[in-house]
Amino acid sequence: MSRDLVFGFCDPRFKKVRDLFARSVESGYEVGATLAVEYRGEMVINLWGGYQDAAKTRLWQEDTLVNVFSVTKGIVATCIARLVEEKRLDIYQPVSNYWPEYGCNGKENTTVYDLLCHRAAMFGFREPVPEGQWQNWPLFTELLAKQAPYRSPGESQSYHALTFGWLAGELIRRIDGRSVGQYFKDEIADPLALDFKIGLALTDLDRCADMLM
């Protein structure tokens, strides 16, 4: 790959950073990447380069989208914080105050605080989940609402890597009526002109980078 495939700008003070970025792309270590850095309130680096697909046929663009995985948990928590700010949600109240079906099988006293702090002991599914149904929101939220926690909620930490989205997202939906993706878009992303999605529209797929494992 040529150095010409690295685009954007870099403050001359940070030329070494640009050189490292270019080297990682040119060497093939990164198929494609983007890097933005603010220093003392000023954007000093905004670089992108390489390709956004495994076949290396589509150049990485300034607006290429990437899957940020669990970074989304922080975005969802921001939506929760907005509901708290609006006094529509009290994190010290039981989840079942907002999602009645959740309050069963040992989860009756689980608070929103427990859920947000990954202390709800609901870090997995006790029953096998159907393949190819990950987008079936009602199915998975119902499974979580009905099952018993793995241990007593609120007593220990356990990262809810896969279940947090359904748990927190359903809490938002029960309070507001909108999906977490729509709530974030309407209340946070669009007003702040953020190009961040929770759920992609078909029109965005062409600018979404492949996931390479």
Describe the role of every protein-language-model region.
Residues 73:
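Short, conserved phosphate/pyrophosphate- and ester-handling motifs at nucleotide-, phospho-/glycolipid
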Residues 79-88:
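Juxtamembrane transmembrane-helix termini
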Residues 76:
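Active/ligand-binding-proximal structured segments within catalytic/core domains
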Residues 5-68, 90:
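Short, conserved catalytic-motif segment at the N-terminal edge
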